[in-house]
Amino acid sequence: MESIGIFFGSDTGNTENVAKLIHKYIGTNISSIHDIANTNKKDIELFNILIFGVSTWYYGELQCDWDDFLPTLKKINFNNKIIALFGCGDQEDYSEYFCDGIGILYNVIRLSKNVRFIGSWTSKGYSFECSKALDKNKNFLGLVIDEDRQPEQSNQRIIQWTKKIKTELNSLLN
């Protein structure tokens, strides 16, 4: 399997911790992990398979490092790349903006031709009012983690999602 680049932005450490677990469960021999705060355009362009992790802040805003990187992200050509997204959010205190960061990244990346997204995730088991991270079938565009309200479910969700990612990658690459 090709090398997978895992890029995350984190203020509190939650998204970084999720990224580290994804790195572990995907396989440290086939993936590398990068803080978006120390990333440039070329770092991302090296990979054909990318996993982006973002948290949502305040009223549906990107985590600050992703917000700073957004102009660069818009310049990257994601044609023929495979993308998976994950995010952290608080479904109780920010129920109207739950994990909107995933949707913001998705809407930038999807403008590239032939980009493939993998890793959609069920919205069952979460309680929120609204999210930009939902697709037309009301599934999340990627893995959603709520360390504030459901920390006991995080590890199992990450394990299940990384298995799903591996299965989807195997079918796309074989």
From Swiss-Prot:
Keywords from the named record: Electron transport, Flavoprotein, FMN, Transport
SS bonds (residue pairs): none
The UniProt record lists the keyword Transport: yes
Residues of the Flavodoxin-like domain: 4-166
GO MF assignments: electron transfer activity; FMN binding
Matching Pfam families: Flavodoxin_1
Keyword flag Transport: yes
Superkingdom classification of source: Bacteria
Cofactor: FMN
InterPro entries linked to this entry: Flavodoxin, Flavodoxin/NO_synth, Flavodoxin_CS, Flavodoxin_lc, Flavoprotein-like_sf
Signal sequence coordinates: none
Family as reported in the entry's similarity comment: Belongs to the flavodoxin family.
Function of the protein: Low-potential electron donor to a number of redox enzymes.
Record protein name field: Flavodoxin
Source organism of the structure: Buchnera aphidicola subsp. Baizongia pistaciae (strain Bp)
Lineage: Bacteria, Pseudomonadati, Pseudomonadota, Gammaproteobacteria, Enterobacterales
Gene designation: fldA
